[in-house]
Amino acid sequence: MNYHLKYWRHYFISHSRHGTHSPFVYKLVDEVIYQKDDPDTILNLPHDIRATGKAEEKKYLLVDRLLKVFAYDQFVFLTEKSLASYETLFKHRVGSYSFRKIYYVDQMNLDLNLLTSINDRDMLIVNEPYLSAEREDYWNKLKDDGRVVVTVDLYRIGLVFFRTGQRKENFLIRF
């Protein structure tokens, strides 16, 4: 199916924050995903992000809000090409003593061996999980893996959590 047709399908079957029944995901959607950015943040976007369009701006601002909320002390980039703006953002937001690692995944051919080194506090940010058939297959394998507890599918970006003490759920959220 065409990338844009998949987007419209996702748009019509996804939910807002009121369609979620998980307190963790409701809070994530309400306080991070649907949060408005202040005008200064939008004006200070890197030029390469601004040049790629509104969709990339929204993703960049979302990643910025995620990094502000989820304290982390390590990050790993699994990308095919250099993403200088994102790397700078991750370096700027890194803290200490949080014992969380955030993985930013933007590759075509990936396997699930990455999950062997992940802890329950870690988070995966998967860029464009529907961009190609290979990425969509990887995204579906991630969602089905037993180590993955919560996935939040925003179509252009996917969030994966490994939280213990919560039942396995996959959420389609309108973004």
List each model region and its residues.
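Short beta-strand/loop segment that forms part of the nucleotide-sugar
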Residues: 124-127
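A short alpha-helical cap/connector motif
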Residues: 1-120, 130-175
